[in-house]
């Protein structure tokens, strides 16, 4: 199986950065991208000519803020009317619109046309990029992957992430929780030195999400005891506070409001992100942005103390899930053997300090790389699930939990829980319900997730009707409802009337915002089309480069006395004119088609090559070897650099 399918990879699909790993040669390799970076920005940009993903997209964001999309993870699996989506929209430079089924759609301009994308499609583009990074490294096509999600992601967010995988053309072997993946990285790292059962708390604070999980690890068994978190808290929120602070400072100093200018805000945000990172290692830093707004330069200093003060409520908010998680796991904080830090935002000294104080001064574990631990664990799980691991990992067993209670609505809008939160998955629970009134012909099964006593305060996942119940007094019919959660944390619900044998079932996939099979197929086709367009752009650039290279090489070759001196003035002029014509043509036709570049190069070669070849034959004498030295202009060789008037 391992050979036919190629290797399976592990992808940490992050809010701000993503990372990919693979199990190879008895260990995990975290794979660098084409820029040499081991993490890739989760950014997709659309321009008049092309689509950019990753570093290329993030690097041009200040020039093109309206059409550069990021934070898709803060939209995925959420409804447009969700308050967090509405709040985020105020901060994003790109436009998000609603749709008839309350699904947020990202609106951008691509090649001069308005296009709408779902969060799943944007995430799928990032997944494709991560797959390509892995394929370039492994040298073969990759089909199978394990993709991670925050432990506190709900059912619809998980399903939407799985759909993103399908659109990207990946076969998602499993959706696993980020803290659990990080625990695998920690567990393998510490495997040799440990005996007996260990309680480990994973504190995962990333760019956009926050999770806390408690696991017991023993002999390769990773059992999650409890999980808690906030799917909308992370490094970006700390950046936002700093951006707001400097916007008001700019207003105070210059009496001008930059909050309506997307480009100025983006440049400020980039500077704030950099300043935040610097403040993790120094006590004070400066922000310097030339001509930020209406020609005004902006210089400001910020101290670590000021940064901590403006985010203090958010830092404290990070401690609440830690307490909740310990309570749910029924573990006292003194019984936690190791506190493991994951996610880039755990580098913030104040977060360290608060966590250390909470655990009464206990040393925190910093032995695993906070940016790569999740992808590392996902790669291990991918190897196990695809049967490619070795004895080192084969005996690993992951027992994860469902983060939110699941149940259905009974008379009076009461939430009746079938599966309490922190139940180990996969799991299956059945319960018998009955009718509420005499001769009731059917029952409406409404499935909710959440911890509140009334369903109106919880999240509706989906509903379906079980009809065809024979007339009977209330309380007589027996309706058996079965909740079944698979290993991805995705729920199936079925209901059956025991007496009449009527059955109905639903895969709870948040019917409202869920993509249908047809929509996913259409998006897969779109994705293939965009990929083909990207390839086309790449070919154009290569053809243009090839022609440019050849023309400049030729120009330099005839300037070289050793060669130019051997040409007759006529021949020299002929080549010079042809080269100048080609360079002129290039300047006016940057956007030409591939075949135009190729024809132009053939035309130029047709003029130059015979003259150069003749010269070499003359130089070599009859029967002599043709010297192919450094002087011969090879297409693709770097030009000689000299002053050209």
From Swiss-Prot:
<feature type="region of interest" description="Disordered">
    <location>
        <begin position="620"/>
        <end position="645"/>
    </location>
</feature>
<dbReference type="GO" id="GO:0005524">
    <property type="term" value="F:ATP binding"/>
</dbReference>
<dbReference type="InterPro" id="IPR029048">
    <property type="entry name" value="HSP70_C_sf"/>
</dbReference>
<protein>
    <recommendedName>
        <fullName>Heat shock 70 kDa protein</fullName>
    </recommendedName>
</protein>
<keyword id="KW-0346">Stress response</keyword>
<dbReference type="GO" id="GO:0140662">
    <property type="term" value="F:ATP-dependent protein folding chaperone"/>
</dbReference>
<dbReference type="GO" id="GO:0005737">
    <property type="term" value="C:cytoplasm"/>
</dbReference>
<comment type="similarity">
    <text>Belongs to the heat shock protein 70 family.</text>
</comment>
<dbReference type="InterPro" id="IPR043129">
    <property type="entry name" value="ATPase_NBD"/>
</dbReference>
<keyword id="KW-0067">ATP-binding</keyword>
<keyword id="KW-0547">Nucleotide-binding</keyword>
<dbReference type="InterPro" id="IPR013126">
    <property type="entry name" value="Hsp_70_fam"/>
</dbReference>
<dbReference type="InterPro" id="IPR018181">
    <property type="entry name" value="Heat_shock_70_CS"/>
</dbReference>
<feature type="compositionally biased region" description="Low complexity">
    <location>
        <begin position="627"/>
        <end position="639"/>
    </location>
</feature>
<dbReference type="GO" id="GO:0031072">
    <property type="term" value="F:heat shock protein binding"/>
</dbReference>
<dbReference type="GO" id="GO:0044183">
    <property type="term" value="F:protein folding chaperone"/>
</dbReference>
<dbReference type="Pfam" id="PF00012">
    <property type="entry name" value="HSP70"/>
</dbReference>
<dbReference type="InterPro" id="IPR029047">
    <property type="entry name" value="HSP70_peptide-bd_sf"/>
</dbReference>
<dbReference type="GO" id="GO:0051085">
    <property type="term" value="P:chaperone cofactor-dependent protein refolding"/>
</dbReference>
<dbReference type="GO" id="GO:0042026">
    <property type="term" value="P:protein refolding"/>
</dbReference>
<dbReference type="GO" id="GO:0016887">
    <property type="term" value="F:ATP hydrolysis activity"/>
</dbReference>
């Amino acid at each position: 199986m391992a050979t036919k399918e190629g290797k399976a990879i592990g992808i940490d699909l992050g809010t701000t950065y993503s990372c990919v790993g693979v199990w190879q040669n008895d260990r995990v390799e975290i794979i660098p991208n084409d820029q040499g970076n081991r993490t890739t920005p989760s950014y997709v940009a659309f321009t008049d000519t092309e689509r950019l993903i990753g570093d290329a997209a993030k690097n041009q964001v200040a020039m093109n803020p309206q059409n550069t999309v990021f934070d898709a993870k803060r939209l995925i699996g959420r409804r447009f009317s969700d308050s967090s989506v509405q709040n985020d929209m105020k901060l994003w430079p790109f436009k998000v619109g609603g749709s008839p089924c309350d699904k947020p759609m990202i609106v951008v301009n691509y090649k001069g046309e308005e296009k709408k994308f779902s969060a799943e499609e944007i995430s799928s583009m990032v997944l494709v990029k991560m797959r390509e990074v892995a394929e370039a490294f492994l040298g073969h096509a990759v089909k199978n992957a394990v993709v991670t999600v925050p432990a506190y992601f709900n059912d619809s967010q998980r399903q939407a992430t799985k759909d993103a995988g399908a659109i990207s053309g990946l076969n998602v072997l499993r959706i696993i929780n980020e803290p659990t993946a990080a625990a695998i990285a920690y567990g393998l790292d510490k495997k040799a030195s440990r005996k007996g059962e260990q309680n480990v708390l994973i504190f995962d604070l990333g760019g956009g999400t926050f999770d806390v999980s408690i696991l017991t690890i023993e002999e390769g068994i990773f059992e999650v005891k409890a999980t808690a978190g906030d799917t909308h808290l992370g490094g970006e929120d700390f950046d936002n506070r700093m951006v707001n602070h400097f916007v008001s400072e700019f207003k105070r100093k210059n009496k001008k409001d930059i909050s309506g200018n997307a480009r100025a805000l983006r440049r400020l945000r980039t500077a704030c992100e950099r300043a935040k990172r610097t403040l993790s290692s120094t006590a004070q830093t400066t922000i310097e942005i030339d001509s930020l707004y209406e020609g005004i330069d902006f210089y400001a200093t910020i101290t670590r103390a000021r940064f901590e003060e403006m985010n203090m409520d958010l830092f404290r908010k990070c401690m609440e899930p830690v307490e909740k998680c310990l309570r749910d796991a029924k573990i006292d904080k003194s019984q936690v053997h190791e506190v493991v830090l994951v996610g880039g935002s755990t580098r913030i000294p104040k977060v360290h300090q608060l966590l250390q104080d909470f655990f009464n001064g206990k040393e925190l574990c910093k032995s695993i790389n906070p940016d790569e631990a999740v992808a590392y664990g996902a790669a291990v799980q991918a190897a196990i699930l695809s049967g490619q691991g070795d004895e080192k990992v084969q005996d690993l067993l992951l027992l994860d939990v469902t983060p939110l209670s699941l149940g259905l609505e009974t008379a009076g809008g009461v939430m009746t829980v079938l599966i309490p939160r922190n139940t180990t998955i996969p799991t299956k629970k059945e319960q018998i319900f009955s009718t509420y009134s005499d001769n009731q012909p059917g029952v409406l099964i409404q499935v909710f997730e959440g911890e509140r006593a009334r369903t109106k305060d919880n999240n509706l996942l989906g509903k379906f009707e079980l009809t065809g119940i024979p007339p009977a007094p209330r309380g007589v019919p027996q309706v058996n409802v079965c909740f079944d959660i698979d290993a991805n944390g995705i729920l199936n619900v079925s209901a059956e009337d025991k007496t009449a044998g009527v059955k109905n079932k639903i895969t709870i996939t948040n019917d409202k915002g869920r993509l249908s099979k047809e929509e996913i197929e259409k998006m897969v086709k779109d994705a293939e089309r965009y990929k083909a367009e990207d390839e086309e752009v790449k070919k154009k650039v290569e053809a243009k480069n090839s022609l440019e290279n050849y023309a400049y090489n030729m120009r330099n070759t005839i300037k070289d006395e050793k060669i130019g001196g051997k040409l007759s003035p006529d021949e020299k002029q002929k080549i010079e004119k042809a080269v100048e014509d080609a360079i002129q043509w290039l300047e006016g036709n940057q956007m030409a088609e591939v075949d135009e570049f190729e024809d132009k190069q053939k035309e130029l070669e047709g003029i130059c090559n015979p003259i150069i070849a003749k010269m070499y034959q003359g130089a070599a004498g009859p029967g002599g070897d043709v010297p192919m030295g450094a002087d011969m202009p090879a297409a693709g060789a770097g030009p000689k650099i000299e002053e050209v008037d």
